């Protein structure tokens, strides 16, 4: 993804970093969302049921919609290959929105791409 900023370095220092092995889920559709994740390395599939809506990789955010609207997770994040993720809590997310240049544009870009991806899947 061609982002305005590379969030990995900031997220790695601002968040808690975890390793998730292939085949595991980061979160499940319907879960309450208290954090978001920035993918440092690896690949995550965003799925609804068994339909892959999107595949995300390094420098991409997942789980951020729950930071914006406090609604449950809208999809399941399934790890396709071993991944390192930076966990960003609500407080850090708000700080990033307020203080990190271009972060809001970064999130809007991810949202736009996700909407386009879902539209493409639905039209198939």
Give residue ranges: language-model regions.
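Cytosolic regulatory regions built on CNB/CRP/Popeye-like sensor folds
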Residues: 1-124
């Amino acid at each position: 993804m061609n982002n305005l900023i590379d969030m990995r370095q900031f997220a790695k220092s601002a968040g808690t970093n975890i390793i998730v092995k292939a085949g595991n889920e980061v979160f499940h559709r319907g879960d309450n969302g208290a954090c978001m994740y920035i993918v440092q390395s690896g690949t995550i599939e965003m799925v609804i049921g068994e339909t892959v809506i999107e595949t995300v990789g390094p420098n991409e955010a997942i789980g951020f919609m729950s930071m914006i609207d406090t609604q449950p997770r809208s999809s399941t994040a399934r790890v396709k290959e071993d991944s390192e993720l930076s966990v960003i809590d609500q407080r850090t997310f708000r700080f990033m929105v307020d203080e990190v240049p271009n972060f809001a544009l970064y999130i809007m870009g991810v949202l736009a791409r996700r909407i386009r991806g879902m539209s493409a899947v639905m039209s198939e």
